[in-house]
Amino acid sequence: MSSPEMVVAECLKAFPEVERVILFGSRARGDAGFRADIDIAVECPTADILRWSDIEEAVELAPTLLNIDLVRLDTAPPELRTAIRHEGRVLYERAERSPAG
């Protein structure tokens, strides 16, 4: 059986715009309680607002009973991006990442 965070990562892999999925917060640190929410950062710089909405909807429909906090990494505040880079654990990274624009 997959962990709840891997279930979410699997949902996100279906979107070609998703370049990286990063777990952060208490689950990444290893100090989460049984019912702790899942904090997920998504790197998807090419996704427009409609596609981001599709991504959010897919995560809402993920087969888990836990709350999921989804953050778009490219629009997150700098302090949060720094924290995610420091404590985050990459769950998925697309093999072919799009070139920087």
Predicted ranges, named:
Residues 1-20, 28-34, 43-101:
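Catalytic core of pol beta-like nucleotidyltransferases
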Residues 39-41:
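Short, well-ordered beta-strand segments
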